Amino acid sequence: MASGVGAAFEELPHDGTCDECEPDEAPGAEEVCRECGFCYCRRHAEAHRQKFLSHHLAEYVHGSQAWTPPADGEGAGKEEAEVKVEQEREIESEAGEESESEEESESEEESETEEESEDESDEESEEDSEEEMEDEQESEAEEDNQEEGESEAEGETEAESEFDPEIEMEAERVAKRKCPDHGLDLSTYCQEDRQLICVLCPVIGAHQGHQLSTLDEAFEELRSKDSGGLKAAMIELVERLKFKSSDPKVTRDQMKMFIQQEFKKVQKVIADEEQKALHLVDIQEAMATAHVTEILADIQSHMDRLMTQMAQAKEQLDTSNESAEPKAEGDEEGPSGASEEEDT
């Protein structure tokens, strides 16, 4: 195998094997480098070509005169030195990159530990703040409960002093049962106006000369009326719709108009039935009010009689007491006068 450059190639000719492989296992040379003069097998030739891009490799011919590099061997030596320097630089740069990566990883670990410590401190501070907020909320809730208790007590006292809503609603209902013109109970029914009136409305009010009836008579009359008007109107409506729809001469617009007219009639019947039901409710309420009024009037009359009797009894008691006092005085003077006469 050949070794060295320059004059060494003149002394040691090529033996036809690869200079990079082990001597005992070196295969036959296939390429030779024109710059450095070494012979290489196919694998080492590719490696040499990639490592030294400026070198030129040619096919090695066995038995031919060995090719020698230029006499100036300094170029090859310089190139090899430059290659070594480049390799050393690459190694140094790789080592620097590794150290930088280690430093970065260490700094990242330190930052992570700092972040974890900060997170822990933040969590602790959040827990402390949450506990403080819970304590404040509990204290505020206690204060609110106390205030609510006080306000409820005040509200109860105010409610006791004010009217109950149910009482107010009852007062409104009672006011509605009164005549708006005269303020009396609605105890009569006007047949012409179909309205509840008081006893003064047909005398000095707007219902003079109208046909009147009692509440009981009006209630029985309205209740006895046939309530099948709505049912009859619906049956008649269905029959008319069937007849109208079977007529081929009837257009779409005419059918719409017919349906609207028929439903207006049914709506009028429904309104009449509604008015009748409302009249019955009003009459029942007026009858109940009149009945209660009669009962209250009887109670008041009974109370008046009792009060009169109590006043008379008191007057008689006072009179008897006044008549009894002079007799008692005369009895006291009699014995004293007799004793004086005996002394004289």
UniProtKB/Swiss-Prot annotation:
It comes from Homo sapiens. One of its GO terms (molecular function) is zinc ion binding. Pfam families: zf-B_box (PF00643). GO terms for cellular component: cytoplasm. Residues 93-165, 330-344 have a biased composition (Acidic residues). Interacts (via coiled coil) with TRIM17 (via coiled coil). This is Tripartite motif-containing protein 44. May play a role in the process of differentiation and maturation of neuronal cells. May regulate the activity of TRIM17. Is a negative regulator of PAX6 expression. Zn(2+) binds at residues 179, 182, 201, 207.
